[in-house]
């Protein structure tokens, strides 16, 4: 406007509503949030074909994330039921990191976050025994599937106390006492909600098409 104020027309209002739906679930993994940003940018430029293609790719990416999260659960369930191999194994941190396939910094971070408590050898070295390595494999698999440290800690706490555990339920249901809850603390539920939102996003894109068509008649 001449006085410097922004003028919002019907299209802008619908675009803001669409953005609200797009960012309702803060899923960050695999560039999902970035894809939503690109979708909104495309709609802002009236590029409806690009926006529709991005939405399609977004659904495929979510499906892949859900599959990986579920696969991790199945692997962990089998590991929990299985027996520990190489009972007499004893490794130092660098050896354990190589054995598990992670960095020593990752191990240190997991220890600092309470996921693992280690014994020390007589000369003061941290020692990773067979049970520790099994635990580390569980952590690595779940972290690779993008579960949060808090969610993994819930599961490990259940295992430590020999409680009956439904792995999927524990990983995706934060305790009421947890102060801060992120989408990765309930990963599969968040991804499923994000996928449900795509139906609403498709409607939003169609509405924007109609509004744009009226504007440029």
What are these regions (language model features)?
Residues 1, 103-124:
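Major-groove DNA-recognition helix of helix-turn-helix-type DNA-binding domains
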Residues 2-92, 130-217:
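Arg/Lys-rich, alpha-helical DNA-contact motif
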Residues 8, 97, 110:
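Append "Primarily bacterial transcriptional regulators
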Residues 86-107:
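Polyanion-binding surface elements
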